[in-house]
């Protein structure tokens, strides 16, 4: 039975009872360990990987020139509570046949196939992390192309604490359906177009209707009772 890359690295690194290993050079990723070769940032050892959920993973980029990872070590067990990406099967089944809420597609090509997206891009709500307590409305169907873009937008928001404005899309009347560009713990991602484009559109219709009703009534009163205003 083929072992996972996490298991393969643990076999090579041999952490002790405290979860501490030696520095393992990436040049050692050869022969029976060749599957550990790092590509696209080293997905098996990223901070959201199974390895990083269990261990504190450290990198050394100073052995060679450039910004590539030269060595990896484990520096103890990770005691932090980590967000689990698992999505309950009934939720997946309910959403996988729907069209992308941003682009309206559900295809078979790489960029049009549906992925089930965690609406909250920060993924720090442990209720959503728990398959026993997560809800259908915590997720949305996005095609891969839309999900890839959203992921980068959420990454920028996390780095800057500035939320993405829906007015970046021509024709969108409001920047947010709740809150403003400043990320807050109170609202989190709620109010951002990327969090819920369907709710954004519903909210926009209600706001426009309310504004139109107000302006219409003001216009009628001014027209009928112009003398009273004079």
Curated annotation (Swiss-Prot):
This is Type II restriction enzyme NlaIII. GO terms for biological process: DNA restriction-modification system. It is an enzyme of class 3 (hydrolase). It comes from Neisseria lactamica. Its EC number is 3.1.21.4. GO terms for molecular function: type II site-specific deoxyribonuclease activity. It holds the Pfam family ICEA. The gene is nlaIIIR. Keywords: Endonuclease, Hydrolase, Nuclease, Restriction system.
